[in-house]
A protein has these predicted regions:
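The feature captures the conserved acid-bearing segment of alpha/beta-hydrolase catalytic domains
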Residues: 6-95, 110-112
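Hydrophobic core segments within long, regular secondary-structure runs in both alpha-
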Residues: 4-5, 138
């Protein structure tokens, strides 16, 4: 979608098939992720994840409920996931070890001057977006 610059993903860090630890992968036939992908560049990304999500574990690892080939769907740690996206979009520094700012229960990890942002929503699960204040979301969209 060439006309879309801002992307928002809610409770959806990379899964273990989309990134193998080295490369992004394209979904193929029968959900096989074998072809190396080059994700979009020149875009802005906001990811929102809850620390208490039983379906998509914040710290990575297999979902307790989402099936996948060979068992349960594995996920990449949410903070690692946004770091991988930031590197793909042009970030050359180290992974952030702490939040860039804190807004209540939300820790904000910001890369590339706010073009790649992760909201770590503490004490929330798969409903993490419900904890967002409209102003915090608009702040990302306005930049």
């Amino acid at each position: 979608l060439p006309n879309i610059k801002n992307y928002i993903s809610a409770v959806s860090p990379l899964n273990g098939f989309q990134h193998d630890g080295k490369n992004f992968k394209l979904r193929g036939k029968e959900n096989n992720y074998e072809v190396i992908a080059k994700p979009l560049s020149g875009v802005r990304l906001l990811n929102i994840s809850g620390t208490e999500d039983p379906l998509v574990p914040y710290g990575g690892g297999p979902s307790k409920a989402i099936p996948a080939k060979g068992g349960k769907l594995p996920f990449v740690d949410a903070e690692e996931s946004i770091f991988l996206w930031a590197k793909n979009i042009g970030y050359e520094g180290k992974k952030l070890g702490k939040a860039s700012k804190v807004d209540g229960k939300i820790e904000v990890f910001s890369y590339l001057d706010g073009d790649v942002v992760h909201f770590k929503v503490n004490e929330h699960g798969h409903n993490a977006t419900q904890a967002l204040r409209e102003e915090l979301l608009l702040e990302f969209l306005r930049d």
